[in-house]
Regions:
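Conserved beta-strand-loop-beta-strand element in the redox core of flavoprotein oxidoreductases
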Residues: 1-13, 19
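FAD-site-proximal beta/loop scaffold in flavoenzymes
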Residues: 14-89, 192
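Active-site-proximal substrate-binding core of FAD-dependent oxidoreductases
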Residues: 85-114
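Flexible, glycine-rich terminal cap/loop adjacent to redox cofactors
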Residues: 106-116, 121-218
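Flavin (primarily FAD) cofactor-binding/catalytic cores of flavoenzymes
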Residues: 6-9, 54, 115-118
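A short, glycine/Asx- and small/polar-enriched loop/turn
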Residues: 1, 56-57, 143-148
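Short, acidic, Ser/Thr-enriched surface-loop or helix-capping motifs
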Residues: 8, 49-50, 155-156
Length: 218
């Protein structure tokens, strides 16, 4: 098997005798004999409400079997909710997985949260963007990184962050500031100029992307 792709440095080809596909897991609720119970499933996933309770009052479910995210951090959040609700049946709490971030620990790392440009175009949502390359900041320049970037997508009127996508070293760490901004309503203005960024930390690439998005606001 071979694959070819075009890059700024020219065409690149790779050949291999084996292709490893690791693209997620399939729920196996059908192996739990749930048909003999009142627990409802949908496309193999166990259906739960916001408290992680199934269609049977005293039965809770969490993790990969309940949602397609199949991410450890979402399962951790669900586990905290289920643990509380099992111990406190008269004081149930709800799980909140929004916004759902993810990271790919490849080389380079990739991290993402919220909408992509394709999502926003498809939904006809107005947006502005700020894109900063790692090479624009001191740490990235010192690393001689030429392909890493941080992209911030924001509402053109309010500056609310709609999504962010990072590729490069420490992307899985850098994305957290933008997750926090989305979660707590901190827009590009507040995050870019409402705090100081340590120099020459790699976080400056996030600052530059936020500044570019801020400057593009209407």
């Amino acid at each position: 098997m071979s694959i070819s792709c075009e890059t700024p440095l020219g065409d690149v080809s790779h050949s291999s005798e084996i292709l490893l596909v690791a693209t997620g897991r399939t729920p196996t609720a059908d192996e739990l004999d749930l048909d003999s119970t009142d627990v409802i499933t949908d496309c193999g996933y166990i259906v739960t409400d916001e408290t992680m309770r199934t269609s049977v009052d005293d039965v809770f479910a969490l993790g990969d079997v309940t949602n397609p995210h199949q991410l450890k951090h979402s399962a951790n959040a669900e586990a905290r909710v289920v643990s509380h609700n099992l111990i406190n049946p008269d004081n149930l709490i709800s799980v909140d997985l929004d916004p759902m971030p993810y990271a790919i620990f490849s080389n380079p790392q990739i991290a993402s949260v919220g909408a992509t440009e394709e999502d926003l175009l498809e939904s006809q949502t107005e947006y502005v963007k700020g894109v900063a390359e790692f090479s624009e900041v001191a740490y990235g320049w010192a690393m001689e990184n030429t392909d890493g970037f941080c992209k911030v997508l924001a509402c053109p009127h309010t500056g609310r962050i709609l999504g962010s996508h990072i590729m490069g070293p420490q992307a899985s760490t850098l994305i957290h500031q933008l997750i926090q901004g989305m979660k707590f309503g901190q827009g590009v203005k507040e995050l870019s100029r409402g705090m100081l960024y340590v120099h020459p930390a790699l976080n400056e690439v996030v600052e530059v992307a936020l500044l570019k998005a801020k400057d593009a606001l209407h």
